[in-house]
């Protein structure tokens, strides 16, 4: 009886690149651990299609390939390191923790990026210290994967991430803030509030607002309301209030939505600049937030917002979150509205909450 795996392994050495590619693909389908070492050797193939097929095959084989791929992280050929680390980013386990930590110092940013991602998968607290310096890596993709890895590690990384909030380099602070948001840890709230009001860099403060929204702790509500007064932070703070979902924010959000009735908003003029754009964004975010919180007190304001172009779509989406509760006020608006365009959108919103068009 023919040994299909052995046949395909032999075909990896064929002179025809198409045959080598097909063999690698077939070995990925068969998922036999015997193919790991031959496939790793093919990572050095001159043809990219063959290398890619071998990479996919190793990924398909999975766990049996982990330790062999870990050894590839010190291969003298950088391409082999890149391909091996890319697979480990998805299948790594604790057996390759040490080679991955060493790979964080690779001169190749692709290897550093994949190594950081792989360590996030392993989630070993011992990798926090070697990961933290990569928050200031010159390559954005490396910084982002490091931030995600530290967030995945969670509690063990919190002290290092909180300490990084006072780093002299703004990029380190920025990615530390992002990581803390991803952890969704209540312990990060007070440090992030300090960043929100004290950091000298606007981008860092903006990310602090986003992170507080991700965490969703109600302690941040009153501080986010205060942050709404700062130009540039207003739309972000409104969005964060919606994500937190605390009803204390509802009156503030309704007040924001009332801004759509101002003449300079409902009938914009040329030359209003960035502030006008920010006001438009804030109005939409307020409608979205009210829909997320779903306090029925907000329904009249959202119904009224249907009449204005700048808020119509977001208000309609928000109203649908309330379900059948909004049918009566929408029908009342429909009865007194003469504008055909507005009437169309009212009917569309009614249909989305289950009101049949034939009954309108």
Residue map of PLM features:
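Core helices of alpha-solenoid repeat scaffolds
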Residues: 4-5, 36, 66, 97, ...
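Disulfide-bonded cysteine-rich modules in secreted/extracellular proteins
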Residues: 5-12, 73, 104, 159-165, ...
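Structural detector for internal amphipathic alpha-helices that build alpha-solenoid repeat scaffolds
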Residues: 1-2, 18-32, 41, 48-63, ...
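Amphipathic alpha-helical segments within extended alpha-helical solenoids and repeat-rich scaffolds
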Residues: 259-261
């Amino acid at each position: 009886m023919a040994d299909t795996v052995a046949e395909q392994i032999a075909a990896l050495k064929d002179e025809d690149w198409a045959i080598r590619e097909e063999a690698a693909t077939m070995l990925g389908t068969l998922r036999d651990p015997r193919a790991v070492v031959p496939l790793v050797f093919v990572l050095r193939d001159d043809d990219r299609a063959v290398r890619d097929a071998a990479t996919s095959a190793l990924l398909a084989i999975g766990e049996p390939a982990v330790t062999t791929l870990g050894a590839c992280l010190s291969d003298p050929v950088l391409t082999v390191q890149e391909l091996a680390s890319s697979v480990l980013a998805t299948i790594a386990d604790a057996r390759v923790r040490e080679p991955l930590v060493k790979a964080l110092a690779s001169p190749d940013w692709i290897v550093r990026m994949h190594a950081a991602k792989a360590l996030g998968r392993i989630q070993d607290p011992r990798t926090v210290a070697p990961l933290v310096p990569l928050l200031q890596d010159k390559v954005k993709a490396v910084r982002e994967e490091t931030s995600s890895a530290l967030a995945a590690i969670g509690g063990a990384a919190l002290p290092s991430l909180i300490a990084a909030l006072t780093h002299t380099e703004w990029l380190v602070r920025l990615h530390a803030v992002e990581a803390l948001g991803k952890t969704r840890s209540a312990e990060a709230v007070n440090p992030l509030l300090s960043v929100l009001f004290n950091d000298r860099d606007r981008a860092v403060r903006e990310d602090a607002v986003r992170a507080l929204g991700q965490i969703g702790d109600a302690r941040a509500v009153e501080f986010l309301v205060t942050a709404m007064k700062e130009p540039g932070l207003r739309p972000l703070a409104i969005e964060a209030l919606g994500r937190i979902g605390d009803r204390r924010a509802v009156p503030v959000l309704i007040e924001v939505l009332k801004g759509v009735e101002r003449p300079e908003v409902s009938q914009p003029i040329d030359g209003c600049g960035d502030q006008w754009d920010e006001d438009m964004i804030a109005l939409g975010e307020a409608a979205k937030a009210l829909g997320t919180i779903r306090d029925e007190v907000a329904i009249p304001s959202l119904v009224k917002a249907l009449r204005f172009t700048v808020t119509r779509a977001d208000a309609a989406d928000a109203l649908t979150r309330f379900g059948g509760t909004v049918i009566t006020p929408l029908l009342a608006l429909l009865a007194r509205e003469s504008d055909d365009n507005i009437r169309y959108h009212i009917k569309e919103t009614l249909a989305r909450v289950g009101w049949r068009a034939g009954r309108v």
